[in-house]
């Protein structure tokens, strides 16, 4: 694979991981300060591409000090154990709720297979990481990397173990702000089966108040942050409104997605361009929102 390294600024570099040759899906970031950090690892299947991207930055694997996922879904940290095996000096920073899962992977892997089906096998099975090499990052945890610190902002909603990492005036947002399609100049929500809409909106509001310069999306690439969180909140709320209306009309998830295709410019185009890993992403988001609505209704 011919990985192309991109320079965002003197400290932040990034590349398209291209798992199973799928481009514009996963961005990997390298923060090169006095300490060197790898933000996200991608899935196990793209380990060789990850190594190539690191070396393209003029780094050796021993140069990596920290491996920092936003959360442990397979597309973000499924390759964590694999890269930790060869980055012998690195420690991984994870949410306290993810700590046990990455050291004892059975429930993590089984849950991933139950939710993702064959896609989990495409991503590949994670490897466990020794607890001695894990750092549990509570809310507000800070780590000095040199010129700047990196700070943990817990942003649940997409996942209970989701962290947005703040570096200087920028943020690595993972999936907390949805999916960014630069060619469409549009972002859309992304929600797994156990989505918490209330927490997702709270997380977006937390980020909205921090006045970032740039947002670094895992899906996909850097984006200037001006007005983005307000737009993101509005987009999440609009989707939820349409999903609720669809449920009231007794529509299926596919029928609700068709409504969204009609109402959201660029959504159908983005769906058609999705590769093998993302084929049902927007449908999954509708179903994640439907699941949240049903759980909320059951509480009443």
Give each language-model segment a name:
Residues 245-300:
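C-terminal regulatory/interaction regions
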Residues 2-57, 165-175:
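Conserved beta-strand hairpin/beta-sheet module of binuclear metal-dependent hydrolase folds
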């Amino acid at each position: 694979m011919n990985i192309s390294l991109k320079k965002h600024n003197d400290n932040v570099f990034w590349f398209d991981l291209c798992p199973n040759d799928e481009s514009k899906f996963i961005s990997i970031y390298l923060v090169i300060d006095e300490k060197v950090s790898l933000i996200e690892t991608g899935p196990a299947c793209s380990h060789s591409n990850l190594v190539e991207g690191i070396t393209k930055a003029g780094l050796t694997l021993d140069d990596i000090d920290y491996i920092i996922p936003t959360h442990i879904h397979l597309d973000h940290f499924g390759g964590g154990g694999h890269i930790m095996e060869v980055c012998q000096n690195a420690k991984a920073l994870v949410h306290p709720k993810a700590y046990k899962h990455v050291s004892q992977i059975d429930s993590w892997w089984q849950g991933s297979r139950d939710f993702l089906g064959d896609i989990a096998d495409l991503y590949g099975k994670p490897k466990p990481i020794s607890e001695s090499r894990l750092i549990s990052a509570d809310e507000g945890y800070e780590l000095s990397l040199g010129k700047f610190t990196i700070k943990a902002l817990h942003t649940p909603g997409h996942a209970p173990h989701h962290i947005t990492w703040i570096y200087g005036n920028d943020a690595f947002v993972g999936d907390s702000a949805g999916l960014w399609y630069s060619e469409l100049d549009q972002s859309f929500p992304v929600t797994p089966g156990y989505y918490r809409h209330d927490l997702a909106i709270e997380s977006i509001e937390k980020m909205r108040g921090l006045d970032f310069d740039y947002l670094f999306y895992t899906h996909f690439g850097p984006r200037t942050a001006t007005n983005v969180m307000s737009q993101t909140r509005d987009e999440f709320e609009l989707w939820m409104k349409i999903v609720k209306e669809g449920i009231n009309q007794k529509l299926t998830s596919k029928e609700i997605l068709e409504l969204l295709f009609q109402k959201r410019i660029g959504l159908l185009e983005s769906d058609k361009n999705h590769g093998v890993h993302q084929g049902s992403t927007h449908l999954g988001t509708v179903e994640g929102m439907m699941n949240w609505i049903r759980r909320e209704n059951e509480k009443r």
